[in-house]
Amino acid sequence: MAFYGVAKRIVQVVLWPFYKVEAEYRAELPQNKGYIMASNHVSDMDPVMLGLAFHKQLRFMAKEELFKIPVLGRIIRALGAFPVARGKGDQTAIQNAVKVVEDGGVLGIFPEGTRFKDGKLHRLKSGAVVVASKTGADLLPACIQYEKRRFLRKRVKVTFGIPIENSALGLTGQSKTELRAANKLLAQGIAGLLGVEVP
């Protein structure tokens, strides 16, 4: 955690000439339990911007290829990220995600599964609600929006919404029907912050 704080400060200094990150919190967030933050996905910079905006350490899943890059792999692992094999139903990554939440951490997930630059919210994959089902954790909808400008100090707005309590998700098990319904609630939360239609 100490390394994370130092690294976050260094990143803030390095990126200051290029990005102005603004955070908005729509509600008071849980302090003494783990939960899942789920956001739209626009850019490779999203984990960094969300990390700068958020008041606690975020533990992100990251594609496994990044961990094979010398130096970078060690840095992102030290910052608390862990690998996921995309498109393979990676059970080890799910287990790691569950452990983050059960240990009282905040898990960061991009449920769309990949980046989209069209300003819309796309169909969500089930990873976030699967972890919620396994842990009893709440879901925190979030969104990230980049100002469309080419010059220095691009404005980045990060909005953290109202947590969706686990009891409202209706997850008595892991049936496809329950997961779809819970995903719909999460999509509504993210889409509402973005001001777009629910996929």
Predicted regions and their residues:
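Non-catalytic C-terminal accessory region of glycerolipid acyltransferases
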Residues: 2, 92-199
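A generic structural signal for alpha->beta connector loops
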Residues: 18-20, 57, 78, 104, ...
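A generic local structural motif
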Residues: 20-26, 45-47, 94-96, 126, ...
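Secondary-structure boundary/capping signal
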Residues: 22-23, 58, 139, 198
